[in-house]
Amino acid sequence: MSHPLFDISGRRALVTGSSRGIGFALARGLLEAGCTVVLNGRDAGRLTKAASELPGDVHTAVFDVTDGPSVAAGIADVEDRVGPIDILVNNAGMQLRAPLLEFTDTDWHRILNTNLTSAFLVGREAARRMTERGHGKIVNICSLQSEVVRPGIAPYAATKGALKMLTKGMCADWGQYGVQVNGLGPGYIETELTQPLVEDEEFSAWVRRRTPAGRWGRTEDLVGGVLFLASPAADFVSGQVLYVDGGMTSVL
């Protein structure tokens, strides 16, 4: 028998950027835990395909998480069609690798909007309703790079470091209304988008050497952390980032 502290069956969860990769795996985990899940992205066809591959009560919501009016309309539509959002996972994100001296203004604003502004916009709209109802869980997908950085990814690390502090700020503002806001910080995770790095033997050897667990992470490694942070077991946990990185942030 499962412990009631970890029971989230019947809750409604919105996962942004969930047509593939980490977001898709987190959506699957929430569905398997008994949640109703709404997948989000900008490509309707890709979302429909993703939904067809998942079990349980799954819905889709096409809206641009970097555009305020689109987010406001999207959240309202989700609550009208599916019901009140109990759990929000701000997963939408991107990576652009380039030395800082070569990083363009356009790419800077693009990565900032995708990784940080989206969490602010979607989090704010969801929290308007959560705070009125007196409960809610928000999980922002941060990163190992919220704490440390390698050459060539400074803008990405800047957005993820800022997302860590936005998480703490959301906690400070909304905690009094029964809303817990936490972060999940993946380490190096094998996905479709990281496959070129996985196949780079020199880089993969570095990852294995630097990670006490001795391997790349898998998307399913992240599910347990999200299920915990979304559950009643985490009702007195807020403003924290749970790093799921095989121990990388703990060693030199």
PLM segments and residue spans:
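Residue(s) in the substrate-gating loop at a strand-loop-helix junction
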Residues: 143
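Short C-terminal tail/terminal secondary-structure segment
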Residues: 2-4, 148, 227, 238-252
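Conserved glycine-rich cofactor-binding loop
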Residues: 12, 19-20
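Alpha-helical segment proximal to the catalytic Tyr-Lys
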Residues: 128, 172-173, 235
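Short, small/polar-rich loop/turn modules that mediate ligand/substrate recognition or access, typified
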Residues: 175, 180, 237-239
